Amino acid sequence: MAKIIAFDEEARRGLERGLNILADAVKVTLGPRGRNVVLEKKWGAPTITNDGVSIAKEIELDDPYEKIGAELVKEVAKKTDDVAGDGTTTATVLAQALVKEGLRNVAAGADPLSLKRGIEKAVEAVISELLASAKEIETKEEIAATASISAGDPEIGSLIAEALDKVGKEGVITVEESNTFGLELELTEGMRFDKGYISAYFVTDAERQETVLEDPYILIVNSKISNVKELVTVLEKVMQSNKPLLIIAEDIEGEALATLIVNKIRGTFKSVAVKAPGFGDRRKAQLADIAILTGGQVISEEVGLKLENAGLELLGTARKVVVTKDETTIVEGAGDAEQIAGRVAQIRAEIENSDSDYDREKLQERLAKLAGGVAVIKAGAATEVELKERKHRIEDAVRNAKAAVEEGIVAGGGVALIQAGAKAFANLTLQGDEATGANIVKVAIDAPLKQIAFNAGLEPGVVVDKVRGLPSGHGLNAATGVYEDLLAAGVNDPVKVTRSALQNAASIAGLFLTTEAVVADKPEKNAPAPGGDDMGGMGGF
């Protein structure tokens, strides 16, 4: 395909236009008084959301340079969402502010590489201050406050706090749709490990890109499976039982994988294959954990079991299995309670006897998966559109609360960035264009608070000036319009969210500033007419 190339200021401004279009659509959602955005879907009802990354994903632009600019900012939102589970809108607003200030300085003749270095040093200094000012979460109420802000609903916040209290920070919290109106919390025994489906052909829910198996058999094999003959016996027995099958093995490839996929596509037999978690001895131990939890056995030649001879009695079972591209969750494994308790006691003893911090950490993870269980939050709503939006908010709030437990909290509402910045810049000594780069960060960190104030109908400049004069931790509670001690009022953000937002925004801003050329696909002017050729050469007949 032919390419078009833009250079210098034209290239950077094209990227900036794309960034601005996307950021302007996303930033209306920031803060307690932020608005929603309606997203049209090709199929089904439209989605209403205030989640930055969901909005960003839906935006596709015509202009090739603008499209690339928008894609770069999508990456900021996505990366922040992946790491912290929230803060996507803050990251987008910060990226827009950093790029705007940065490009102004590049146009005025500043050296882009020096600006980038200055931005990186300033961001590092601000993050150090953020981490130093972080307060560890100690109570259930603090978790509830953090989750409530993310979800915009105190009821959701307190439910998430209760769920985290029950399963611990290593436990798993999932969100399911409910037929009843309102919210309920259900605790189920379960386990999650970080391996997803081997092939996307196994997906049963295309929108969420996950495979859901109800009441499946679970085949656990400590070796590779490539020959379909090994699987035939067990597949026939499972198919006769009319149940789906989860296969956990070192790897599944070749004709064995192809057979499973073909049967899934034809609708003959529902299954999903995932790789076993871990490596070496740790893999063996984790497979044994899964076997005990599900009431199955690990099929391994070491213990004299061969796959081709396996019957249903060697397979585990569970109420439900959910597999995404990255992880597998087994809910309500049918294992014997005494055996599970024995395994938990054995792992606890290993933790006590272990000298290695790394081994202890890995054993602790295994213990949490066996003993922690899974908390299921069931959400209901009046309409499908509202249900989708509510479910999404709860999922974000869960990740937000976990981030808060992990690294602590800081004052919310964009205040922590400004106050950490004030301390960081007082001690930062840079020269020349690096100092200019640091100044870009100094200006940009005001942007989230300004946007929160703007969305609340207040004058952004006045609010920022007022906050600068307040004691540390005090700021604007945009929900009430009152200036107060934000942590005491329960207005807080996980430091992990704020830190990730600033880091990712600065990373992309540095790329924008140092870009000198953009190569894009040339837009096609005349798309071919639908339905075949234009009868060229037929003299109009």
UniProtKB/Swiss-Prot annotation:
Can you name a GO cellular component term?
cytoplasm
Q: Which reaction does it catalyse?
A: ATP + H2O + a folded polypeptide = ADP + phosphate + an unfolded polypeptide
Show the GO MF annotations.
ATP binding; ATP-dependent protein folding chaperone; isomerase activity; unfolded protein binding
Keyword vocabulary terms for this entry: ATP-binding, Chaperone, Cytoplasm, Isomerase, Nucleotide-binding
Cellular localization per UniProt: Cytoplasm
- Give the EC number(s) under which this enzyme is classified: 5.6.1.7
Q: Where does ATP bind?
A: T29, L30, G31, P32, D86, G87, T88, T89, T90, G413, N477, A478, A479, D493
Is Amino-acid biosynthesis included in the keywords of this UniProt record? no
* Gene3D superfamilies membership: GroEL (3.50.7.10), GroEL-like equatorial domain (1.10.560.10), TCP-1-like chaperonin intermediate domain (3.30.260.10)
Q: Its Gene Ontology biological processes?
A: protein refolding
Subunit architecture: Forms a cylinder of 14 subunits composed of two heptameric rings stacked back-to-back. Interacts with the co-chaperonin GroES.
Task: Provide the function of this protein.
Answer: Together with its co-chaperonin GroES, plays an essential role in assisting protein folding. The GroEL-GroES system forms a nano-cage that allows encapsulation of the non-native substrate proteins and provides a physical environment optimized to promote and accelerate protein folding.
**Which protein family is named in the record?**
Belongs to the chaperonin (HSP60) family.
**Know the name of this protein?**
Chaperonin GroEL 1
Organism lineage string? Bacteria, Bacillati, Actinomycetota, Actinomycetes, Micrococcales
> Which gene name belongs to this protein?
groEL1
